[in-house]
Amino acid sequence: MTDAIDPDLIERGRKMFAGDWHFIWASPSIETLPPMGSVEIAFAGRSNVGKSSLINALTGRNALARTSHTPGRTQELIFFEGPPNAGLRLVDMPGYGYAAASKAKVASWTSLIHHFLQGRATLARVYVLIDGRHGLKDVDLDILKTLDKAAVSYQIVLTKADQVKAAELAERVTATVAALAKHPAAFPEVLTTSSRTGAGMPELRAAMIRLLDERR
């Protein structure tokens, strides 16, 4: 699923995410975005795919990002910042694909996300979270097209890997990699994670360290 990652990147990722991570900003509209500064890495995905749980698992803080059992509850861009020497912000994006949301609300979220993606020079990558039990859906493919148009680098992360048999997960990774061949802005490697067991978190942290190194 992933090639062997440099142990130094794994260790640097562990140290950075063991530091003090905290909430800094919530933006319900493009006009209320925080000033650009640190490198930003955003997390997108369908409602209840596990974005908040993944951010909590990454940082080792159970309550940093609020999790909700109500799909579509996160309606803002939520910014978190790490230790001063990290130079990194994490952005929890509004969940998409919640059928019960009103058309006006969906339009508002869509506008916010599109403007954020197209006008944020500090945005290094978007991790698009896909439920590992189900794989890519049409609504996910729509988001990938949006990212392609915005020329924003993105990578797929299959979540809830602990709830899928190993052989089935491997097949899902292969199918996802094949689908990404049609998307020019997609990073060709697919990551798998479990917020419950911590599987895949060291590799995801290491990938972020590598991104930071590339931006410096």
Curated annotation (Swiss-Prot):
One of its GO terms (molecular function) is metal ion binding. One of its GO terms (cellular component) is cytosol. Mg(2+) binds at S52, T74. InterPro entries: G_ENGB_dom, GTP-bd, GTP-bd_ribosome_bio_YsxC, P-loop_NTPase. SUPFAM superfamilies: P-loop containing nucleoside triphosphate hydrolases. Keywords: Cell cycle, Cell division, GTP-binding, Magnesium, Metal-binding, Nucleotide-binding, Septation. Its cofactor is Mg(2+). One of its GO terms (biological process) is division septum assembly. The keyword Magnesium applies. Residues 37-214 form the EngB-type G domain. GTP binds at residues 45-52, 72-76, 92-95, 159-162, 193-195. It holds the Pfam family MMR_HSR1. Necessary for normal cell division and for the maintenance of normal septation. PANTHER family: ENGB-TYPE G DOMAIN-CONTAINING PROTEIN, MSS1/TRME-RELATED GTP-BINDING PROTEIN. Belongs to the TRAFAC class TrmE-Era-EngA-EngB-Septin-like GTPase superfamily. EngB GTPase family. This is Probable GTP-binding protein EngB. It comes from Rhodopseudomonas palustris (strain ATCC BAA-98 / CGA009). The lineage of its organism: Bacteria, Pseudomonadati, Pseudomonadota, Alphaproteobacteria, Hyphomicrobiales.
